[in-house]
Each structure stands twice: as C-alpha cells, then as structure tokens.
Amino acid sequence: MSTHLLEQLIDAFRILPGVGQKTAQRMAYHMLEREREGGQRLADVLSRAIEKIGHCTECRDFSETKICAICANSSRDRHQLCVVESPPDRLAIEQATGYRGLYFILQGRLSPLDGIGPHELGLDHLGQRLAAGEVTELIIATNATVEGETTAHYLALLARQHGIRPSRLAQGLPLGGELEYLDRGTLSHAFGTRTEVV
C-alpha cells in the first residue's frame, strides 16, 4: 500500500499556522478514520473559497464581490478611514467598537528586511483615496510592534501630505500585542481614546 497520498495530506495540513508535523498527522488520521464526510465538505468549501474569494477593490479586504459589503454600505461614514494590518484586525474592530467609517486593509506591515515596502501594502492606492478629498481623518490601527509602529509613522506622514488628520489607537494596546487577540473591552477603550499622531 502506498502512503504517498497520506504524506501529501499531512504536508497539506502543515501549511496552516501553528500546525506542526504531529498535529498534521493527527488531523489527517482523524479525518480519514472518523470524518470522511466532513473532510469532503472541507475540501469542497476550500476549493470554492480559493476560486471565488478575492479582494475588495476599495479596501483590500477579502470579498466575493468587486466591492465588499462595508465599502458598498452608503450609511458608513466616508470621512473616516481606519487602516489595519489584516482582515482579522478589521473584524476585531467591527465587533468590538461602534466604528461606522470605512477601512483600508494593508495585508501586512512595512518590513524592509522581509522585502515588504509601501508598494506591497497598496499604499499607492491608499494615497489615491486620500487625494480624492473625501477622507478627513485617517485612523491608524496597526499593531503595537516595531513594524506596526514604523508603518503607523509612514501612514501619518502620508495623511499629512494630503492635509488629513492622522490619529492612532491609544491606551490599552500592549507593546508587542496583536489586535486580533485583544478582548473587546480593551479594544473598544483603545479605539475610543485614540490620539492624534504627532
């Protein structure tokens, strides 16, 4: 009996964050022994998601349509634009705060050592949105890491170049912390007490 396909399945599970060799083996064996129907459902949904989910042309969030539901919602405040590093960060803010503005998802943060510069984060597109004149406040909600702070500084400079007031989330964000792991109360307080970037 060939185990080549089983090895491929185990390797495929290892692409998930936090999944090492042992966990991948347990997942593969569990699926084959007890969850074949669930595994088929997972394969079908995963295949459709990879085929149909792209990025919103306005905010760069994941979306099945050209413009996501938040950007298409005419009741959102178009004068406020909140910049986050990732879709989970946007979701955390959306669930924990009463924020009703729009978003821009960087899909990362500035990291010259990793070859991630302004172009990779879509900052040329962000600059065009700021130049359009609709945004009056840029809310910078990057993580409190070295790269996040560097990105925040760059974003503040970009906002000022367009005559837009930049603000930064404050109080409650631990240094080195990631937004998606904060509790709702902490994130809501930090969002409500954001300060202007100096």
UniProtKB/Swiss-Prot annotation:
Keywords: DNA damage, DNA recombination, DNA repair, Metal-binding, Zinc, Zinc-finger
UniProt name for this protein: Recombination protein RecR
PANTHER family listed in its UniProt record: RECOMBINATION PROTEIN RECR
Toprim domain: residues covered: 79-174
SMART domains linked to this entry: TOPRIM (SM00493)
GO BP terms: DNA recombination; DNA repair
Stated role: May play a role in DNA repair. It seems to be involved in an RecBC-independent recombinational process of DNA repair. It may act with RecF and RecO.
Organism: Xylella fastidiosa (strain Temecula1 / ATCC 700964)
CDD domains cross-referenced by the UniProt entry: TOPRIM_recR
Family that this chain belongs to: Belongs to the RecR family.
Zn finger residue spans: C4-type: 56-71
